[in-house]
Amino acid sequence: QTGFHKRKDEQQPLLHAPARKKLRSTSEYSCQTLFLNSENSDIKICALGEEWRLHKMYLCQSGYFSSMFSGSWKESSMNIIELEIPDQNIDVEALQVAFGSLYGDDVLIKPSRVVAILAAACMLQLDGLIKQCGKTMKETITVKTVCGYYTSVETYGLDSVKKKCLEWLLNNLMTHQNVKLFKELSINVMKQLIGSSNLFVMQVEMDVYTALKKWMFLQLVPSWNGSLKQLLTETDVWFSKQRKDFEGMTFLETEQGKPFVSVFRHLRLQYIISDLASARTIEQDAIVPSEWLSSVYKQQWFAVLQAEQDSEVGPQEIDKEELEGNSMRCGRKLAKAGEYCWRWTGFNFGFDLLVTYTNRCIIFKRNTLNQPCSGSVSLQPQRSVAFRIRLGSFDSRGKLLRSRTTGYRILILKKDQEQVVMHFDSRLLTFPLYICCNFLYISSEKRIENNRHPEN
């Protein structure tokens, strides 16, 4: 099963810009005289209605032909070989490039052709050409290529390219939302993205839910061709109409919705219901099963009691598994240089965290009495928070130009204390600058104890 739905190749300038790759040192004479002019050919290869007059000596560089000629295959002594091409990605042009790579030291790999050439290279076991296809892919990942690349490398086993595609998607899914990308992303890939703590979230977890809602609408109505600005309104209208037929069920409990359950399971609902407006929206949408929400409400109520009555001061050590799986994900785009101060919405168990960007520094402040706060604040002498900050700036194709991270850390703050948590070189600053944070305000051990049912 591939990672994306197939889509016709789009004619884009980037895709047709050839990437010149040096493969091996062979002479121009070999390429022109032996390959293109077929002089002194001792074997004819027939495939896809075309024929190539080639040389066994050169073909033996291919693992496929080397096995054929040295083994007990019937073709080992034949001068005319009919190649069966079971892979639909392989065409005549791809075979021409693959055979030519055995003779010449210069191969032109256009990004729009790289999948077909990779398919041919894998069939013929041309390790050098496979490697160069992978390099071309890594250098040309964009919103228009990422889906096709991911699909092909799942098929042909280029794990390093697959990793690069996933990194690109984690960085761009939320920061540079795109209608066509939402249409192409499969359930399997979306599940990996939504479940990751490395998802570059903009704003808060509610925005991840909103993006998922839009993605699900486009999966169900792929013919929709409006703009990104129109998408949320159209999505809400469509689901509103569907609710009339739900008969008391939420959408994920219907036959239409069941395929998407595994993706929505990765939402961190505890950070959605911690904000009143978000909690109301998710209830009104009737997409997420009420049992899921009830379970999270219970979990969060225990956490509130823990923070209020059990002298909870926050995490005392790094629990990477807990941070990866359950941390609050939030982010912000800084459009241009300047001073910024903000807080992310939601109830954080009395820890009112103010974030300031100024003079190439990011500062965290635990606000208690100095500034107004819409919710209650903890007056405990000290509170701790586990966090990670990531910074990134991107080029127009979504490639990460510069990045920096604090890694996971514990910060202990007294009442109204502030602390510089990141300071960076001005050379690293390219605006717009994207900031993404992970937070954990409550110790994981106590939360687990509070949620455990008493044994009979």
Each model region followed by its residue ranges:
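Extreme N-terminal leader/anchor segments
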Residues: P13, A19, Q32, I43-K44
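Intrinsic-disorder-associated interaction segments
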Residues: R20, R24, Y58, E253-Q256
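Alpha-helical protein-protein interaction/assembly modules
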Residues: I130-F302
